[in-house]
Amino acid sequence: MKKLLSILAMSLLFFSNVNAEERESELNNLFKQLKNSEATKAIEIENKIWKIWSIHPSNDRRGYRLTELLVQGSFLMAEKELNGAYEIFSQIILVDPNWSEAWNKRATVLYLLGRYQQSQKDIDEVLKIEKRHFGALSGQGLVQTELKNYEKAINSYKEVQKIYPSMQAPKVMIPRLKELIKDQSI
């Protein structure tokens, strides 16, 4: 398994040898495209953004190792080994608290564990670092829905729509949340 994870991390890194300025420029360009793309093209752009986010921004040994750890944690999360994934993402955050994707992954694990308040705190950290993180904003919508803060959830999804207009989650969730609010007032 460790060898497979190393291969995955190295394949991500093979195409990622860009400096921070180039990375930010690439993200800015992709976000402009995302805002104006139809659904099919937007999914391709979304995948490119996720790829950039999933690679640590520093092109040194430490950055490669942190990327490798993120891949390991993601694998554990996919295998439903949530406590192990939580530990790995926490290690990454200790080493580099400025990498938004480590916070985002840990927020996801916390959500899956039903620890919604803690998940929201991690989402707040993601959004301090990367305010355009549509994954974190969409996750915030889910967290706020679980906490029965339906207006906050709607606002999160509206923020997603500003960044990623063709994303399906807001189109599905906003009407559902409006129904929940309506049902509460009866």
Identify what each model region corresponds to.
Residues E21-E22, I52-E68:
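TPR-adjacent "capping" and linker segments in tetratricopeptide-repeat scaffold/adaptor proteins
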Residues N36, I55, N59, N155, ...:
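Terminal, low-structured helical/coil segments at or just beyond the last alpha-helical repeat
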Residues K2-L8:
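Sec-dependent signal peptide recognition
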Residues G63-E130, G135:
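Alpha-helical adaptor scaffolds
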Residues A78, L112-L113, E146-L147, R176-D183:
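Register position in tetratricopeptide repeats
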